[in-house]
Every structure is written in structure tokens, then in C-alpha cells.
Amino acid sequence: MGDVLVVFRVLPEDVDNDLSRLESKIREKLNGVCKINDIKTEEIGFGLKALNVQAIMPDEEGMADRVESILAGIEGVSQVDTKDISLI
């Protein structure tokens, strides 16, 4: 099996959350679980921003769900959605 690139949209709990701090927490929690390819800020509207996390992981059953659960458990995260999955 190969690897997959999964894009997660991470929404903060509040518009006032420090996204750079949240990005650091994401990198810390996912260290050793998967490889972070990139993290980009996405403007949602009305001052709300989200982080699009591109993660590379093995194409194993349940791996994307595991990473999504880790992201959802980070303090300051309101919601996590899987936006895209691509085989690489």
C-alpha cells in the first residue's frame, strides 16, 4: 500500500483564537503519527479563519479517522472536517 494526502479543515472555537498557537499544537500532537505537508490559513467569513492541514499518512484503514480524532481533541478546536483524500 502507498501513502495518502489528507486535507483536514480545522475550525477554532473562537474568532479570537491565535491560529499560530493552534498550528503549533497541531504540529506537536501529530508528530510521530503522520507527516504534515503544509498548513494554510483559510478565510471563512466574518473574521472567522480555519486551518487547512495537509497530512501524509499510510493508506491504512482508520488512519484518517485517527488523525481527525487527534485534531478534534486539541484545546481550542471547535470542529474538524476531512476535505480531501488523495492517493500519492
Swiss-Prot record:
GO terms for molecular function: translation elongation factor activity. Pfam families: EF1_GNE (PF00736). InterPro entries: eEF-1beta-like_sf, EF1B_bsu/dsu_GNE, Transl_elong_EF1B/ribsomal_bS6, Transl_elong_EF1B_B_arc. Keywords: Elongation factor, Protein biosynthesis. Disulfide bonds: none annotated. SMART domains: EF1_GNE (SM00888). Promotes the exchange of GDP for GTP in EF-1-alpha/GDP, thus allowing the regeneration of EF-1-alpha/GTP that could then be used to form the ternary complex EF-1-alpha/GTP/AAtRNA. PANTHER family: ELONGATION FACTOR 1-BETA. Belongs to the EF-1-beta/EF-1-delta family. NCBIfam families: aEF-1_beta, PRK00435.1. This is Elongation factor 1-beta. It comes from Picrophilus torridus (strain ATCC 700027 / DSM 9790 / JCM 10055 / NBRC 100828 / KAW 2/3).
